Amino acid sequence: MKRLFSIIAAIIMVAGFAVAKDKEAVKCTLTLLDGKTISGYMVDYKTKTNSYGADKIITINTVYIANNPGEAGTEYSANDAKKIVFNTGSEDIECLSMYILRNNSRPLNLKHGNEKGFMNVVYKKDGIIGLASNAKEVFFSTTPPVMKIPTYVVSYCVEGDEVAVPYWIPSDANSIGAKTGLRYCFERFPKVAEYIKGKDFKIKDLKDDPLSILNKVVELK
C-alpha cells in the first residue's frame, strides 16, 4: 500500500507543476541527449496524450526552462532529452524521456510513435525501471457518450530502452482477461509470463502494489 501511495504522490506532485502565472516555478535540471545539462526553473510546459487501449496516458512532452522564475523560458522537447529532474525542496523527482509502446502492438517489438514524453521513475532495481504517468480512463455510456476519469498508469522498461511498456491501470483489477493482457506485457520475460499464468498469481495482488510484479521480473528475468 505504501508503494501505491508513493506512486500517486509522485504523479500528483508532477501534475502540480502545471505552472500558472500565480504559481511558483519549480527548479529542475534537464539532461539532453548529448549529455549537456540545463538547470533553471520550469516556467511552463505542454502535454501529450497517448492511447493505452481505450484509455489515455498523459505525459509532459515540452518544457520551458528559464534562469529565474517569471522570465520567459527556452523551449526543450522530450525528444531531445534523456531525463528531467525536478527539485521540490524536500526531494528530487526523476522523469525519464520515453516513447510509449504503440497501442495494440507487442512488447517484443517495442514499436512506438514519433514523440517522447517525460515519465516519473517510481521503481529502479537491477536494470528494471518502473514508470508512472497521469491518465484518463475512458468509459462509453449513453449519458454522456464518453466519460474520462482521472487516474494513473504504471509502465516498465529495461534500463537502456527508449520505450515504456504500460502494464497497469487501476480498472484492470476488474477486467475480464486481465491476466492474459498482463502476460503479454511481460512476454519479454518468459518465466514472468508463466508466473502470471499460474495459480499463485492474482491480479488483485497488484491493486495495492502495482510495482510488486517488477520484483518478480528482477527475480526471474
PLM feature spans:
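Bacterial Sec-dependent N-terminal signal peptides
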Residues: 1-25
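A short beta-strand micro-motif
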Residues: 24-33
